[in-house]
Amino acid sequence: SMGAATTMMTAGEDTPDQVVAFIEDCGYTSVWDIFSSELKLRFGMPEFPLMYTANLFAITKAGYSFKEASALNQVKKCEKPMLFIHGTADDFIPYEMMDILYQAKPGDNKEKITAPGAGHGEAMYLLGEEYWDDVFTFLE
């Protein structure tokens, strides 16, 4: 998920011609969204006050807001092809985040792979050879 976020954050920037496409596997929309989701899912806690306090701390100590760290905003600017991959049973990054990211990507140069029953980072293992066939087909 962190590699996917890094990929998507880069996708919205000017990249060299050698970068021809982006592939993300089990990525999240933003730091704010994933932290909020985890608070609810793991601890049954609302966003307020913890998220707001932690965000204020990040702003003062690190110089950025959790809402600024948004893969979603970067994907909206991506012009190169992008492949989105996610497992339906991911209990860390909600599967719905892939759909949000996919819809945000402009143009038709995008594809998605859904891995039924796959947990976080398990799509490659559950789909096996099909995973790699789809990835290499996308890159062609």
Residues covered by each model-derived region:
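C-terminal alpha-helix
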Residues: 134-138
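Gly/Ala-rich beta-loop-alpha elbow adjacent to hydrolase catalytic centers
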Residues: 1-7
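Active-site nucleophile elbow and catalytic-triad environment of alpha/beta-hydrolase enzymes
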Residues: 58-74, 80
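Short alpha-helix in the alpha/beta-hydrolase fold that links the catalytic acid
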Residues: 71, 80, 94-103
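Acidic catalytic loop of the alpha/beta-hydrolase fold
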Residues: 89-93, 121-122
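Catalytic histidine-centered segment of alpha/beta-hydrolase-like enzymes
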Residues: 118-129
